[in-house]
Amino acid sequence: MHEPPVQPDRCALSGNYRLESNPVRHDLSPLAAATGNRISRARYVGGATEFLKWWPNYGYTRRTVFGICALLKPVTFGKRVGSS
C-alpha cells in the first residue's frame, strides 16, 4: 500500500493528510525546470550580446553570430519529419 504524502508535523498530529501547495517542490518540477532553463539561457544570450556590444574592438563576427544563434536554437526531442 502507498504511504501518505509527507506533511509537516502539525498535519501529521492532527491526522490531516490533505495535500498542500509546496512552492519549493513546484520549482523542481520538470516544466518549471524547462521554463527556468529557457529563461536563464535567454538572459545569458542577452548578457553575452550586450557584453559584445560594450567591449571595444571586438565587434560581431560570423563566428560570434553563429554561437549566439546556436544558443537561441530551441532543443526539441521527437521524431524527425518524414522518418519512420
From Swiss-Prot:
**Keyword terms of this UniProt record:** Plasmid
- Specify the superkingdom: Bacteria
Q: What protein name does the entry list?
A: Uncharacterized 9.4 kDa protein
Annotated organism of origin: Escherichia coli
